[in-house]
Amino acid sequence: MNSKIYFDNNATTQCDEHVIDSMLPYFRNNYGNPSSIYSFGKEIKEEISKSREKIAKLLNADKEEIIFTSCASESNVSAIMNAINNNPSKKHIITTKVEHASIIETMKNLETKGFNITYLSVDNKGRLNLDELKESISDDTLLISIMMANNEIGNIYPIQEIGQIAKEHNILFHCDAVQAVGKVKIDVKEMNIDTLSLSGHKIHAPKGIGVLYVKKDLHYTPLIFGHQEKNKRGGTENVPYIIGLGKAAELLLEEETEINTRLEFLRNKLEKEIKENITDVHIYGDLENRLPNTSSIAFKGIKGEEILLVLESYNIYVGTGSACNSELAEPSHVLVACNANLEDYSPIRISLGKYNTEKDIETFIKILTNVVNMLRSLKDNKNGK
């Protein structure tokens, strides 16, 4: 097999050709510093402003509420530290057991500094219990930080309800929307979100660019000091990547509905045909409320890593969980939180993207069926069956 089938779009996405084309002039000719007072710099600053407007529109935000960062992890940490700076007398934060590593690891670090962190549990389908959230709130709570959609199992969480709970208790609400942008309709005003993080490389823009939305009436103390971004994020602006991210947002506004309808069709076709061709299959997550492109699927008796490695020999690429944890020999913290039987059902994560086709699905099903049957046969022979 020569052509590549890439089914790991929750890890990263291919940069859109239109995005690349929009960026190139800012590498070659339009390389001025946007902080310069001469026209060569001012023109660049105006283009940055246009990108800011496009991203704001994607979130139903105002452009003044958009801060460019280097990545979503920076945005996440910035949002958390700002909440702490805004509430110096409080020491309690509420998050979940299934957040991205940049949230979880920041919370662990804060625990060493005397903060009290509540990690909300999930059920075996990865669903939150909002009663547990309400019961966890105290007078000492300074922040609720909950993701909009999970990167491993695809669950979409009830952000509007969570935002309302936070608002009723006058608690800041941060949302990691990295996996949701482009797949879920986001309205920061309607959802009562105070701060929100997103990443360029999950929406066909380049790696190395992110956004932090900060509600305009919220006092903001930067993580990185400097005069750029109206004193909210220091460092010379990454102009080409900002332009590329703006173009990606523009494309999403045009294509989002059509792409998601097609991705959901392809994902459902994939799962249906897998279950028709392979026995003892388990799909993780909330199947009624999940991203249209994501399937966390396991095959009894076969490790997800084993399937991944054999598929790679066919030029097919899937994930086994978060790409940010893939080098660690540890089980997925998300699936552990779901009380998953990882000994028998260790999953692969299939996350489709806009460049995947129905032919990709058909080719994948044939090869996957053979791979699973082969691995099971080898295991049976080893066990003397």
Segments from the language model and where they lie:
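Pyridoxal 5′-phosphate
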Residues: 1-385
